[in-house]
């Protein structure tokens, strides 16, 4: 634990604001967007040739051009720029991008314009002395790029290619935002993130073709070693995501336990996996994927064994259906509080959706060897590509249909304390104290009553209150005046497409806090609550502010402290109105 805190604090180094020349190596496949190309990189030297600590990872953002689009994993670059510490925009309920980069060990970011960088050489062009971990990671990602090229050569394209790459290799950069929202809305985002479920399909294949034929002791040892190598090779190929590393560690411990006649699939092996992972990379402690993976596995290990002796488990088909539902329910039960707290949404249909698409996901993963063999040999490429595309279409169509069901997406506003309370109740419920049926029922009824009371208190504390929100949006300056969840006003300088530009705030803040969309005001406006004239806004509860967008207020000296509480200087303003507000500087707050 203390190593995690130390590693987190170690990322808070201060970068110099001066422009310098740096050498860096790209650590992942560059992500191409409409205007920029982004990539994770590791610094290897400064402008004076001095060595830079190898944990000095950066996020590089290139201005998009034909040269930037050719960048690959392992390329070594020299660039000039100002490295700054990642910061969020400060908008309410926004995605914590700074924390996301910090969890990946990235302590700085830099924008690199055209002709401000030069590629020295690629990964294969020169022998370099990198650490073993970095070298293996780059090689694994290069192999993954080659496999993706094989996928493309078979004729896979579009949404089918993006889904197949995500399910088999963990490459999610090609997935559209619409498809990601569908998987997240139905509660099956774990299907797109490589985890124990995907590795479980691979393990089932290994058991069928390798371990079932290893009867003698030395053959079992050889088979276990071969299976472990294949599992870890696949994990490295996928980029070592925390959820997949956890599954690979537990499977390795399970194989080791089977050789000595002991079960390696237990809470003890789960705890050992967590300790080993945090020793390797303490920053995984803050990764939400790491947290959800271990919570889901803890729920499966503690809840599922209690239902193995039920009478209905005697029939094979019923047992398969019941066990699949039980595993999904146990995993969802222990992850819902954290998902609701971190993401503000959860789905009632997550367990059912997982049960429906699991067979399709299994067929897609089992199709990976076939599509590779077809792409390499050139035999049956059309048939394989058509079959993979058809399976992917069926899976996506099933989830799109579920997305239309009532209460498919439930928006929540859980506080940290309510989330902790939910986990306290769950942990006590699975303790030996509640093993007997009577105690479990008694504690269950009591915990339901107390949880409902805690939920009511949570809603009271999280209820929206009158406030003014100044959104940090460079292309759409906006001020949100909120009176209640039913009544609010959005003042903006943009005449067109205000809702489209504010869509990410709408999804994260408005749908979570407001029961009705705000009234968009782009000009003069007046009603019983608020009025606006040339950017000067005044309303009930003493609300008053001025949005400076042009020079219409220049030369006016009547801006006394009693008239305006906030002065919002919008981007592009070049007037002289600020010269006449010095007498109100004690009470007026300036926002730019």
Where are these regions (language model features)?
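Membrane-interface amphipathic/re-entrant loop segments adjacent to transmembrane helices
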Residues: 119-138, 185, 340-356, 366-423
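Hydrophobic alpha-helical transmembrane segments in integral membrane proteins
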Residues: 2-19, 438-444, 451-477
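Divalent metal-coordination and catalytic microenvironments
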Residues: 81, 167, 195, 239, ...
């Amino acid at each position: 634990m203390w190593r995690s805190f130390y590693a987190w604090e170690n990322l808070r180094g201060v970068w110099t604001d001066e422009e310098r020349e740096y050498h860096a190596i790209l650590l992942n496949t560059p992500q191409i967007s409409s205007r920029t190309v982004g990539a994770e990189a590791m610094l290897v030297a400064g402008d004076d040739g001095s060595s830079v600590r190898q944990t000095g990872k950066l996020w590089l953002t290139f201005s998009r051009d034909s040269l930037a689009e050719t960048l690959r994993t392992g390329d070594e670059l020299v660039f000039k720029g100002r490295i700054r510490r990642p910061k969020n925009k400060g908008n309410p309920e926004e995605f914590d991008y700074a924390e996301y980069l910090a969890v990946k060990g990235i302590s700085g970011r830099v924008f690199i314009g055209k002709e401000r960088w030069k590629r020295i050489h690629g990964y294969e062009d020169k022998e370099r002395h990198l650490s073993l971990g970095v070298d293996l990671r780059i090689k694994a990602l290069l192999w993954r790029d080659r496999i993706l090229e094989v996928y493309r050569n078979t004729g896979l394209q579009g949404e089918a290619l993006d889904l197949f790459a995500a399910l088999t290799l963990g490459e999610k950069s090609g997935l559209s935002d619409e498809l990601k929202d569908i998987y997240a809305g139905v509660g099956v985002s774990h299907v797109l993130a490589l985890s124990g479920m995907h590795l479980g399909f691979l393990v089932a294949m290994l058991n069928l073709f390798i371990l079932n034929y290893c009867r003698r002791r030395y053959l079992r040892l050889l088979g276990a070693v071969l299976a472990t190598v294949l599992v870890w090779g696949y994990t490295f190929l996928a980029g070592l995501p925390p959820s997949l590393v956890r599954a690979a560690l537990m499977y390795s411990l399970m194989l080791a336990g089977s050789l000595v006649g002991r079960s390696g699939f237990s809470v003890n092996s789960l705890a050992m996996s967590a300790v080993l992972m945090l020793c390797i990379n303490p920053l995984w402690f803050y990764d939400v994927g790491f947290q959800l993976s271990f919570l889901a596995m803890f729920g499966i290990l503690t809840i599922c064994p209690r239902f193995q002796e039920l009478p209905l488990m005697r029939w094979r088909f019923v047992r398969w259906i019941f066990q699949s539902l039980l595993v999904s329910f146990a995993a969802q039960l222990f992850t819902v509080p954290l998902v609701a707290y971190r993401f503000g949404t959860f789905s009632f249909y997550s367990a059912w959706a997982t049960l429906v698409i699991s067979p399709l996901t299994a067929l897609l993963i089992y199709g990976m060897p076939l599509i590779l063999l077809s792409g390499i040999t050139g035999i049956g490429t059309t048939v394989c590509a058509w079959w993979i595309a058809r399976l992917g279409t069926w899976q996506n169509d099933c989830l799109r249909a579920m997305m239309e069901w009532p209460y498919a997406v439930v928006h929540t506003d859980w506080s940290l304390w309510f989330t902790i309370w939910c986990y306290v109740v769950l942990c006590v419920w699975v303790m030996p104290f509640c093993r007997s049926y009577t105690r479990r029922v008694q504690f269950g009824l009591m915990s339901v009553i107390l949880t409902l009371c805690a939920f009511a208190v949570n809603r009271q504390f999280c209820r929206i209150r009158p406030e003014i929100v100044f959104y940090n949006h460079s292309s759409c300056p906006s001020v949100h005046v909120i009176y209640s969840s039913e009544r609010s006003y959005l003042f903006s300088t943009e005449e067109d497409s205000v809702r489209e530009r504010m869509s990410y705030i709408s999804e994260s803040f408005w749908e979570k806090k407001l029961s009705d969309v705000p009234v968009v005001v782009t000009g003069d406006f007046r009603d019983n609550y608020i009025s606006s004239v040339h950017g000067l806004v005044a309303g009930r509860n003493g609300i008053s502010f001025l949005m400076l967008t042009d020079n219409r207020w220049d030369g006016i000296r009547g801006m006394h402290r009693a008239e305006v509480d906030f002065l919002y200087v919008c981007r592009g303003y070049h007037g002289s109105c600020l010269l006449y507000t010095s007498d109100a500087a004690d009470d007026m707050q300036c926002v730019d």
